[in-house]
Regions:
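Interhelical loop/hinge segments that connect adjacent transmembrane helices in multipass membrane
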Residues: 1-6, 141, 145, 168-169, ...
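Transmembrane-helix boundary and interhelical linker motifs in polytopic inner-membrane proteins
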Residues: 3-4, 32-38, 50-87, 133-142
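Signature of the first transmembrane helix
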Residues: 5-61, 94, 98, 120, ...
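Transmembrane helix-loop junctions in multipass membrane proteins, especially transporters and channels
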Residues: 29, 33-36, 62-66, 101-106, ...
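Hydrophobic alpha-helical transmembrane segments
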Residues: 111-118, 145-192, 208-212
Length: 230
């Protein structure tokens, strides 16, 4: 990447982040004014969502960034393998989340809210594999064109629901909508189905490569649990 392009790439990243942060701030302010209890339930779901995303990532993003930067592997093949593995971990994490929330005595509605938002975060962890390729190739402009409209549509939906007085179960769909759109746009930009060719041999090969990353994943999950308890 040329040095003169660095400010432009940084601008793409900051533009996407600031757009989402601004829309999220508006959403939380409106929700807090309507009902602090609703905001508290969303906060509980967000905590679970962060855990699901951490498990879905399993420390593979750093591995992807370094591998893509060195150009040691076929990027699309590796991306497909990692995406498939992350999806498997996401599904397992969601199943565990559903049973844990039941064991904790959450109401059925709150369990659904947690499931919706946690699924969204899990999809974010899966889609981050594609964004790692974008970052390694200096294509933050592609990342911005995916993240910004997804955030605006997803959180915008949530804002409309809050203003319209919709039940919390419908408001909670904002994250799932944002993440599904983001995943769909990423697959479209990739131009192929990343799950093609994914199988047991791919899982076994990646399991060896992810050993060190898995340790950091456990540490991050423990930190989130500790913060939740406090």
């Amino acid at each position: 990447m040329k040095l003169k392009s660095l400010p432009r790439q940084l601008g793409y990243i900051l533009g996407a982040q600031w757009t989402r942060d601004l829309s999220w701030t508006i959403f939380t302010i409106l929700l807090a004014r309507r009902s602090p209890e609703m905001l508290g339930q969303i906060a509980v779901a967000l905590s679970c969502g962060y855990l699901v995303k951490t498990v879905s990532d399993v420390g593979l993003n750093d591995f992807l960034l370094s591998t893509f930067a060195r150009r040691e592997e076929r990027p699309r093949t590796l991306l497909g393998e990692v995406t498939g593995l992350k999806t498997c971990f996401m599904m397992l994490a969601l199943i565990v989340t559903w049973f844990v929330t039941g064991w904790l005595g959450y109401s059925f509605e709150l369990r659904l809210i947690v499931l919706f938002i946690a699924t969204g975060f899990g999809l974010d962890g899966v889609t981050d594999s594609f964004f790692a390729l974008c970052q390694a190739r200096g294509r933050q402009d592609v990342e911005m064109r995916i993240r910004v409209p997804s955030a605006l549509l997803g959180i915008g939906y949530g804002i409309v629901c809050v203003v319209a007085g919709a039940p919390l179960i419908f408001i909670a769909l904002y994250k799932l909508i944002e993440s599904v759109l983001c995943t769909g746009f990423a697959f479209r930009a990739l131009g192929r189905n990343p799950f093609v060719g994914f199988g047991y041999d791919n899982v076994r090969d990646l399991a060896v490569k992810m050993k060190s990353g898995f340790i950091f994943t456990i540490l991050a999950a423990c930190a989130l649990f500790y913060n939740k308890i406090n």
